[in-house]
């Protein structure tokens, strides 16, 4: 028996509330004066790297992302160093899909590759991101993956700060799938 859209919507709402409670309980939401990766100033900071070190919160994130992935035509889970790696690793374990780590730059030793893991031109990836603001950080990783010939149409973010990332990714033909929005988290 399949679930109705109403049941699925209620389930996603329950999951969102569970994740919000976990993020707050592990201390991932902080207030003060912060500078974001984009250079913008903010009165709050969402520390998903801290949440990633809490096994209960990381498990909730992985489980919820895995449920979204079931609706996508993908065969590889990717994450950008540093914040996306624990998320993508946990989701890879949950979904049993292969993991790809995207480095921010080429190392001048070892394989000298931007990728850790196998990437083939026919691969269809979903990228995991900790927090999205403007979408600039993840855009570089999307371009590198696409230059290698693989397809990337989805970015799952734990928290979307609702400051333009969705629109910027849409321009690149990528759908942003937030588990939680900042406005929901900060209520």
UniProtKB/Swiss-Prot annotation:
Record: residues binding 5-phospho-alpha-D-ribose 1-diphosphate: 103-104, 107, 129-137
UniProt-annotated binding residues for orotate: 133, 161
UniProt keyword annotations, A-Z: Glycosyltransferase, Magnesium, Pyrimidine biosynthesis, Transferase
The protein's required cofactors: Mg(2+)
One BP term from GO: 'de novo' UMP biosynthetic process
CDD domains given in the database record: PRTases_typeI (cd06223)
Record-given protein name: Orotate phosphoribosyltransferase
UniProt KW Transferase keyword: yes
Purpose of the protein: Catalyzes the transfer of a ribosyl phosphate group from 5-phosphoribose 1-diphosphate to orotate, leading to the formation of orotidine monophosphate (OMP).
GO molecular function: magnesium ion binding; orotate phosphoribosyltransferase activity
SUPFAM superfamilies per the UniProt record, alphabetical: PRTase-like
Subunit structure: Homodimer.
Pfam families: Pribosyltran (PF00156)
Source organism of the structure: Methanosarcina mazei (strain ATCC BAA-159 / DSM 3647 / Goe1 / Go1 / JCM 11833 / OCM 88)
Catalytic reaction list: orotidine 5'-phosphate + diphosphate = orotate + 5-phospho-alpha-D-ribose 1-diphosphate
Keyword check for Transferase: yes
Pathway given in the UniProt record: Pyrimidine metabolism; UMP biosynthesis via de novo pathway; UMP from orotate: step 1/2
